[in-house]
Amino acid sequence: IVDNLMTKYPGIAYFKWDCNSPITNIYSPYLKDQQSHLYIEHVKGLYNVLERVKAKYPNLPMMLCSGGGGRSDYEALKYFTEFWPSDNTDPIERIFIQWGYSHFFPSKTMAAHVTSWNKNASVKFRTDVAMMGKLGFDIRIHDMTPAEQEYCKGAVKNFNRLGSAILDGDLYRLVSPYEGNHSAVMYVNEATDKAVLFAFDIHPRYAETLQPVRLQGLAPEAQYEIKEINLLPDTK
């Protein structure tokens, strides 16, 4: 199928490989030998297909979907550029999902998209949360205001500029969302001359106490310029 599509439409730039259909009614009392191996052989067969796809199209980016169905595995990283961790793209829930996911896979494998889930959350909040992984947009552009569209353009530029830190840097989990009402993570690039801090007030409350966050991973002898980014137009 992949080869047929790439032959007909060589301009295809990206594949989403979805695996949501479970295998049902697979066992039989008449087939005695090695029935318990079915899932093992199925996965081996999948890898065999992916090996052929990768050999013929080595530079084709592919996302492995069905993140909630056990498709996020280390072997698949040989063939896919990213995983879809969950169909739950509510930005508040994603703070928790991405925190847990980060204990097993690096940020560059985590497809994190801005969607229309939780429209009570601003486009800025949704985008900032998604920038902790591989940023993408699954949202109707025409439903956004001109200011929101302009904001997203700037956020994409910032993401591309800071990609070496976010996607390839060291991750520091500073404040766990599971231990309070806030969350903070930090990425530092290999040269320790660039870092990105993400800090979120998950459920803002009146007169709540905000504790300072101690940064990590920076060079102790260096001086850094701190700048807030991803601001909406006309916001200082």
Where are these regions (language model features)?
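Active-site neighborhood of glycoside hydrolase catalytic domains
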Residues: 1-124, 128-149
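Short conserved micro-motifs at the rims of enzyme active sites and ligand-binding pockets
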Residues: 115-116, 208-211, 227-228
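Aromatic- and carboxylate-lined catalytic core of secreted/periplasmic carbohydrate-active enzymes
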Residues: 132-134, 138-175
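Carbohydrate-binding surface patches
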Residues: 176-220
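Solvent-exposed beta-hairpin/edge-strand motifs
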Residues: 216-232
